Swiss-Prot record:
InterPro entries: AAA+_ATPase (IPR003593), ABC_transporter-like_ATP-bd (IPR003439), Metal_Ion_Import_ABC (IPR050153), P-loop_NTPase (IPR027417). Part of the ABC transporter complex ZnuABC involved in zinc import. Responsible for energy coupling to the transport system. The gene is znuC. GO terms for cellular component: plasma membrane. This is Zinc import ATP-binding protein ZnuC. SUPFAM superfamilies: P-loop containing nucleoside triphosphate hydrolases. It comes from Wolbachia pipientis wMel.
Amino acid sequence: MSHINVEKKLNFVNKLNNVNNRVLKIENLALAYDGKRILDNINMFMERGDIITILGPNGGGKTSLVKAIAGINKNYTGNIVLAENTKISYMPQNFSISNLMPITVEYFLLNSSFKRLKKNQSIITETIELAGIGNILKNQVLEISAGQTQLLLLARCLIAEPDLIILDEPVSAMDINARAKFYDIINKIAKKRLVSILMTSHDLNSALPSSDYIICINNTIYCQGKPDEIMKNRTLNEIFSSYAAK
């Protein structure tokens, strides 16, 4: 379990609120399953409106890290500290709806938040517009494409008005055109709402143009920086050969 001194954490949260609009800081995070170390010595921070991509191979710890940040996995040591009152929305990598649930896109989007949103139609309208799903609201969820499903899940995250959205491999099932559309939408969301977006990927080519910052992990962080810094210091082949060497 995570062992955090409460007084230290509260003091740190107060500092976090006053430094560079920072929403998240991770200190010395480590995590193991069945005695096998999955993550070690993870240190990072995130500011409001940032789009950060955690890049790494399958099995490198990306999903374990974002689940820890989202509060789903608490079996870690170290500190994960969020700015006070930070709201998180999390979109898992694998999400499916039962064939026994024939529901519309509109119902799926609004059901969980209807009571909160019924007096604020502007949030609903803006979310649908930002996610670009206005033309599929009456469709059955089971009938829409993989790319449209991801946009629907993104809209469901967004409608909760979060400060931080965590996306685990959000474009893995999409073709190149759907990926470009998805990344364009998250850039608009980050700018319009000043939402911080943390996503995972194993595809550097897709991640680079859409990220403010890249963190490369394979159980630990071995490179990080702005996209141009990553590319200036390492070629694609060097980056992925270093994954394979670990």
